[in-house]
Amino acid sequence: MELATEVAGPYAGKMLADFGAEVIKVEPPGGDPSRFGGPVLPANDNASNGADEAERNALFLHLNTNKRSIVADIETPDGRATIAQLLHQADVVIESFVPGTLHRHGLGYEALRRNNPEIVVASITPFGQTGPYAQYLGADIITYAMGGPMYSTGMDEREPVKLAGNVISCQVGNVASTALLGAWMTAQQTGHGCHIDLSEFEAQTASIDRRVTYLLHWQWGGGITTRQASNRARVLPSDMFPTGDGYVLALTIPAWAPRMLAVLDDDDLTARFDSPDWLRDDELADDILATLYPWLVEGDKADRTRTAQAHKWAVTALNSPVDLLDDDHFVGREYFTTTDHPVVGPHRRTGPPFRLADAWQIRRPAPLLDEHRDEILAELAAATPATADVADADADADAASASSPDPQPIRRPLNAPRLPLEGVRIIDMTVVWAGPACTMHLGDLGAEIIRVDNPYVFPPATRGISPRPPEDLLLDLGALGGAYPNFTTATGNPWNTQGMFAAQARNKKSCTLDIRTPEGRELFLQLVEQSDVLVENNSVATLDKLGIGWDVLHERNPRLVACRMAPMGLDGPYSSYVGFGASFEALCGLTSLRGYDDLDPTSLSTVFHMDPASGAGGAFAVMCALLRRDETGVGELIDFAQSENMMNHIGEYFIDADRTGVTHEPIGNRHPTNAPQGCYPCEGDDRWAVIAVANDQQWQALCEVIGQGELATDARFATRQARQANHHELDALLAAWTSTRSPHDVFHQCQQAGVPAAPVYDEADSFADPHLEARGFFRQQGSADIGTWLFPRHHWQWTGPALRWGPINRLGDANEHVFKDVLGLSAEEYQGLIEAGHITTSYLQEDGTPH
């Protein structure tokens, strides 16, 4: 039962619905606000109610496939009775009411579980169920301002700028669907459901776009990560560049310099790299650009992408959703699917976030408002109530139930609660960020995670720039270099201490093995025989080159689930493309939608959204496959194309592109329909606050807050449409008011009046936040190498079994466990692996050179 509105909760409901769940969407009178939150589509010529904007909004059409709609008002007796009846039938409830609303009506979690001990309730709210900000309102920009690194996104001489559309809320939806599926699996295994408290603020602080790395960097003496005017201060090109017909994003790490040189084919430039100190050559950056610019502008973006990618250099075209609908790669993968809607008519939309046989299907389009009332009420009338009517419970039901003995479970009771993935062993061959984030989630949910690390092949950007990067280079790069404790890499084991690695490394064990050797390959396959899942996100050809492709894995262990998280999928023209998350965000439409509305794409700072979205999405995919294996007894290959999962976060733009052909331009911090929304200057140096008015009531309240009540009836601002048309005037009015106040003054004055607002947080603000402190958000974590520091805890809280919080793994820390306990090797055989060079805890020999 989906009682959630807007984006995050409905996105979680869509994930469950599209993979087979029956989802009933309970809408408030007038409908879910997302019916008015995105591009408005033209009506089908045959539509009788085509003038109704609520049925033609691309955002709602995207978020609500495979759902049925019924309208019920929880504030009326009849509506409350209908909702109570629906909750009687539910396995899972997704809700986003202001905390306390369900409890006030006798429909809180404790009341519901008295009637159904297995019920899972997910409360997805801006700030969680408890804490000083629990009653405060949210929006996509609110979540990013406080939880994401909005402070460091954009240009240093401009205001911070949010990501495009609703991608932050969609990523929260990815996290929520993972939590929901995990909780439901626990309920099936133990008979005990749980209540999930998911704070959008916390989910973002724990995951989005290098936020955890920046928080560690601040603790390690690195200061605040600020906005940068350009990435071109670096020696190697990592920025957006113009071509003959558009733009490309080029990302270059030191290990890829030879690839770049092969493409540019300039002997004089290549000779400059013969010096061991080329990274410190102040003039080299300008000389590279002098060769790069002419090469780019003499060709088109597609050709330059193909040429660079042929040499494995991470150059990708900047595409819009319009560019992609008929792109050869997505046509070849049959990614886009067509849905016929009674008002909008046939339209193409994004396809599955991952491929798992026939698990994903669009069975019906998004519903019309209250479309299924009669059939849903008929089903309720036919159902026999299992218990007394919850609607008759008084407002103290939750408190009374909380003090009473636990109800008896009704399915497969166990002696003690257990996490859903306890007893599941997962081989982790992941790199960089997306894959490690996926296995981190799975470890949190109870799985044993065994990293298989090759000590002879250092993974750049996974455990650092290099095994022992120069400390002066790290000082120059700051948090962008991945962050190290006190910038110390000259001693110790820096491959165990890099911030980006540490951020995703809890609950994992590491063994070392050179799979390139016959002995190493055989030992790896023996581990496969003893495991349930393999997760990897290397280049597509890697497993086959190692002789451990899917056919080999499946033959050795038919029950194995393999989740392969290639950025562009396992087949298609772009499947072999290399890059980081930002590379594929440009290629697949997201980057074209974000940025300042008055500047060209070369002003964009590099952002990474695809990685955290893939982490939560990949964990959901693995659990889906494990559930299928429980039914069939056979494992499956998951083709998790990170780009296709991410494209679902901007799905409304693909629907609009298909129906209208419109290429959407960046709109900065504004909202496509609501107004005003923006980021405004405050008292202090580089201090900012965001305000996001969603309706006329909030606008009227804001007018009173700023002491200009007469503006509420001013014809220029009285309606949403008028405010959009006069947004520049509103921005000036609000900036004049905010500039005399601190960000927190703006935050509290607006929120206490019912107006969504937030300070734009830097790292120091996050650690000083009283709400996060009250909810125990930061917890101590570490290892012998990294020491003990404060890390964000899990992405959600729940009343189920305690999520795991194990130490950060170190290279080879579980060698004895894996080879002796899991594989059963004798002491003599283990010693032989040491002598053969498989077993180690370092990427370097004693003299400091690589193995």
Language model: regions and residue ranges:
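Short Gly/Pro-enriched turn/cap motifs at secondary-structure boundaries
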Residues: A51-D52, F60, T226-A233, S238-D239, ...
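N-terminal helix-loop segment corresponding to the beta1-alpha1 unit
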Residues: M1-Q189, L368, H372-E631, R810, ...
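Conserved Rossmann-fold dehydrogenase catalytic segment
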Residues: E157-V167, Q188-Q204, Q228-N231, L570, ...
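Short, well-structured beta-strand/strand-turn elements
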Residues: E22-V23, Q309-D323, A383-P385, I449, ...
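Aromatic-enriched alpha-helical interface/lid elements that frame and gate functional surfaces
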Residues: P237-H311, V315, V322, D328, ...
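Mid-domain beta-loop-alpha active-site segment that forms a flexible
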Residues: I142, A164-L181, E200-R211, T252-R259, ...
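Oxidoreductase and adenylate-handling cofactor-binding alpha/beta cores
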Residues: G147, G173-C194, A206, R210-Q219, ...
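A glycine-rich dinucleotide-binding beta-alpha-beta segment and adjacent secondary-structure elements
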Residues: H311-R363, Q752-W805
